[in-house]
Amino acid sequence: MLTNEAVLTVFADYLSRDTDFEVILTSRGYTVMGWDKYREDWNTVEYCPTPEALRDALLDAYTSFREMEVTDGERDLTAAEKSKIKSERDAFTEQCEKEVAICSS
């Protein structure tokens, strides 16, 4: 069974590099929040009621982070860049599945 802790472990390195997204533990559960540094305000807030929802929100945040990192927001991604980022996303998903297998053993 996937846990929030396992998801946070898998995404820990990414979260330490991305200063725009944070994971906050609220009284209702985890929430992923995206900061807009130009407007100086939160621009996305996604409540994650399950570990799977947390994983999916972090996959989306990671994709945005990598797209900005690669293009600097100045151009569209090339097909090769899209493919590379998709492979990186798939690797995160695979790591989460491995965490499930480890916890289930």
Regions found by a protein language model. Give the residues of each.
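Short, charged low-complexity intrinsically disordered segments located at boundaries
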Residues: 37-45, 85-95
